[in-house]
Regions:
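C-terminal motif of bacterial Sec signal peptides marking the signal peptidase cleavage site
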Residues: 22-25
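An edge-strand/N-cap motif at the start of beta-rich repeat modules
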Residues: 37-67
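Repeated scaffold domains used in trafficking and secretory/extracellular systems
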Residues: 37-43, 74-87, 111-126, 156-170, ...
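Short beta-strand elements that form the blades of beta-propeller/WD-repeat-like
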Residues: 44-54, 81-98, 119-139, 165-180, ...
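A short beta-strand motif characteristic of beta-propeller blades
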Residues: 64-73, 103-112, 146-157, 193-200, ...
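Acidic, serine/threonine- and glycine-rich low-complexity intrinsically disordered segments
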Residues: 180-301
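Intrinsically disordered, low-complexity segments enriched in Gly and acidic/Ser/Thr residues
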Residues: 273-357
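Blade-level signature of beta-propeller repeat domains, shared across WD40, Kelch, NHL, RCC1
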Residues: 358-395
């Protein structure tokens, strides 16, 4: 077991102060390569950073040694997403979106204020932020983050809602439709943000993912909408109620991995099936798992294989083409999903051939080699981990 080493606490870095620009910006030299190095700012140079929130702050770990290199104070419930480069992570706070320099282990002064920051999507070399409380859609090139506030394109939906947007390779945008009362579909906009087409047959639209060939999928409570080659297609769920609200795609595969919930009346459904959606054949296949899972359980491997972290503590590996369960990797002990979605539960984050798995019950983070199926490292943390994310490798 590799025991983590505390490297000191960064004092008084609050989300509110950062939003007001009181936290110093990083420098201008952008990191390059898989090491996530560079001399952009601060005294640290954390390799392949992995970030983990806890109640009151965020840890930054060296992705190779799993040593805790930074401990940042951060009030409230905060969410994490890769920013799209090998240096930054997007932190969703009560004030809006904020850019965190994970290599330096410190907040930047790059912020996108707005009530109820929602989905962060990376596609076609662009990162898109959707602010639920305002309906603002803001997109930028993540490789410009090393120079401070990036040049940003903005669009505002007709009504604020819990939505998501994806910028396409041609500069167009796929964006959800809805308001505070209901969400019912998607619209496709061109590079001038003029509507090209729409589909309103997607009740409670939620989540997105991109598959091979720029097929964009969004989930519905009765199936999936797929946008590809200028057309929107509905793939219906095989059950009367078949909600797909969280998806994971891969550029290596035309298959989308999604959760699959069938009990419309459940206070908290603990699903034991996942959906594999073929964006080429427009078909949906359900795969039965030996354990339940949560919205933080879905990931993709380096070859496009579907990965599901089960409540039995195993990473279940599914051949996304055949739907066959090919392996189950032991990582942590059995666990149970909490009733409140903000409460800590195990999560999985995959980068390259390494899967990082958090264990709030044991206050640990594990690294798993997906090729060998071996746990290669374990970090012991002082606080129970909640959100799990990290920087991305450059290609």
């Amino acid at each position: 077991m590799n025991r983590s080493v505390r490297k000191g606490r960064i004092a008084a870095v609050s989300a509110t102060a950062a939003m007001l620009g009181l936290v110093g910006a990083c420098g201008t030299d952008e990191a390059g390569g898989e090491g996530g190095g560079g001399q952009q700012g601060g005294g640290k140079n954390i390799a392949d950073p992995v970030t983990v929130t806890y109640d009151g702050g965020m840890y930054v770990l060296d992705g190779n040694t799993l040593e805790v290199q930074a401990d940042v104070e951060l009030d409230g419930f905060n969410r994490l997403n890769p920013a799209g480069d090998d240096r930054h992570v997007v932190v969703s706070t009560s004030e809006g979106f904020q850019l965190f320099d994970a290599v330096a282990g410190e907040m930047t002064d790059v912020a996108f204020p707005g009530a109820e920051p929602g989905h962060v999507v990376r596609h076609a070399g662009r990162t898109v932020l959707f602010t639920d409380g305002t309906g603002e859609v803001r997109s930028f090139d993540p490789h410009d983050l090393g120079d401070g506030m990036p040049e940003t394109e903005e669009y505002t939906t007709e009504h604020p809602h819990h939505g998501v947007a994806v910028e396409l390779e041609n500069g167009g945008v796929v964006v959800t439709l809805g308001d505070e009362e209901e969400r019912n579909g998607i619209a496709v906009l061109d590079e001038n943000r003029e509507e090209v087409t729409r589909n309103e047959d997607c009740p409670e639209v939620h989540g997105e993912s991109a598959a091979q060939g720029e097929a964009i999928a969004v989930g519905c409570e009765d199936g999936v909408l797929i946008y590809k080659d200028g057309e929107i297609t509905k793939v219906d769920s095989p059950t009367e109620y078949g909600r797909i609200g969280n998806q994971s795609g891969s550029p290596e595969s035309p298959i989308i991995l999604g959760d699959y919930k069938q009990d419309e009346d459940a206070e908290l459904e603990r699903p034991t099936e996942v959906a594999l959606v073929d964006t080429e054949k427009k078909k949906l296949e359900r795969v039965k798992l030996p354990a339940s899972y949560t919205f933080r359980s879905l990931a993709r491997g380096p070859e496009g294989e579907a990965l599901v972290l089960g409540t039995d503590g195993k990473i279940h590996v599914i051949d996304e083409t055949s739907g066959e369960l090919t392996d189950s990797i032991d990582v942590i002990g059995e666990w149970s999903e909490p009733m409140e979605w903000q409460e800590p539960r195990p999560a999985i984050f995959v980068r390259g051939s390494t899967a990082y798995v958090s264990d709030p019950g044991e206050k640990q983070l594990h690294a798993v080699d997906l090729e060998s199926g071996e746990v290669t490292g374990t970090a012991d943390l002082d606080q129970a981990p909640n959100e799990l994310s990290g920087t991305l490798h450059e290609h």
